[in-house]
């Protein structure tokens, strides 16, 4: 919207340049001719200082609205009306900007992205969600060895916190050994300080994928598709306890029976056994 002041300036300019009469210019711009006779008075020195102070405070405190800025002015002894402060801020383009999206906290990777070339070199973990027959939530932590595609653990519960994540990892390490790296997204359970400190203490390097890039954790994403297609979508769980039993049975089937195309159609356990005979497993 063009202000009256800007319209008056436009009228004066076209009249001075002889482009048209004042009457015609006012009619075209929707401005009364009497208003063109108006000449703004120069602001007194005290007002100029107040304006400068409003601008200075508004820039120093960009998240403050005009009410808070006025409160600061009154505290300093200035006489400033609410509408005056609001108008000056608007004219100077000093309104409070909308909040941008909050930056999500991310985990700190301690190793470069690594492609597994042997057992226990890279493990990955992630969560998958489902529901029981009565609508209660199920949360599953899955843990796998990226080289053999073995599913090392699936922990099932209604809720899983950082402590549960560490318990599941410790159980898998007791059975299999310590991995060199572990890959995950930036979920709160994986970037929790408790988890990062424990992994550092165990000498396990962390690899956090970029936010919104699940393909960087492609092995476990592919496994989740298999888990959902072959198990979760085929079953109706009446309780968490039943879900634990059924999902654990499927995990055993996947490791011992499921022929994997990337493993030459060996099942994950067969592949792990064959490569373990050729080289020692790190961490055992």
Task: Give the ranges of each region predicted by the language model.
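Charged DNA-binding/catalytic regions of mobile-element recombinases
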Residues: 1-284
